[in-house]
Amino acid sequence: IDSAAQTVVVRNLDTGHEFTDQWDRMILTTGGASARPALAGLQLPGIFTLRTVEDAVAIRQWIDEHHPERGVIVGGGYIGLELAEALAAHHMHITLLEATGQVLPTLDAEMAAHIQAELTAQGVDVRLDCAVEAFAGSERVREVLAGGQHIAADIVIVSVGVKPSVGLARAAGIALGPTGAVAVDDHQRTNITGIWAAGDVAEAQHLVMGRPAY
């Protein structure tokens, strides 16, 4: 993106052909990507994140090919809980690891306690205040090291949030805010005239706190 010339260089990913196009106004919606913590063993086969259709297909293929009996979900947010339900439907023993003191940390503690009770009633092993330290295995993931414990695992899904995809914005000179996402005003305008940003790439204005949020 050349904001001064108001041009953008585009590459056709099928053919490799590149061309330059012009714009009068631009809306940047490059989204975000699953956060991947810098932990040893994260690259082992059998460890997944879930953000795209391709991610879901890869998870399903692993289940069909390896028939895992023990699943570990890292993160007790909305996606983590949905995954717990989905994997339990495949008759796995599910362990859910959450680094904070409750599942769904954005909820009131009283509400979260009811949800945790239901998870436990459905056979999910919920472990709170349990931060992951590393993943272990040789040819594939075999266990998760968390809270000083060794938890056996045939499949691991890491669901610890989203990070904004700001590489293109940064290269174009678009300012990032304190959260690391693109800074915008209450009309989604960036610091560059004629460029707006929205979605997972951009901050939002917290109506109660009166400050940027992500």
Question: How would you label these PLM feature ranges?
Answer:
Residues I1-V10, D14, D21, A89-D186:
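A Rossmann-like FAD-binding core segment of flavoenzymes
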Residues T7-V10, T15-R70:
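Glycine/serine-rich phosphate-binding loop and adjoining beta1-alpha1 elements at the start
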Residues E18, R36-P37, L81-E82, A153, ...:
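Glycine/Thr-rich phosphate-binding loops of Rossmann-like dinucleotide-binding domains
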Residues I27, F48, V72, T95-L97, ...:
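Hydrophobic/aromatic beta-strand patches that form the interior of the parallel beta-sheet core
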Residues G31, G75-G80, G148, G199:
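Conserved phosphate-binding and hydrolysis motifs of nucleotide-dependent enzymes
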Residues G32-S34, E54, Y78, Q102, ...:
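Residue-level detector of alpha-helix initiation sites
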Residues Q43-H67, E139-E143, H150-Y214:
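FAD-site-proximal beta/loop scaffold in flavoenzymes
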Residues A58-L107, V141:
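Rossmann-like NAD(P)H-binding beta-loop-alpha module
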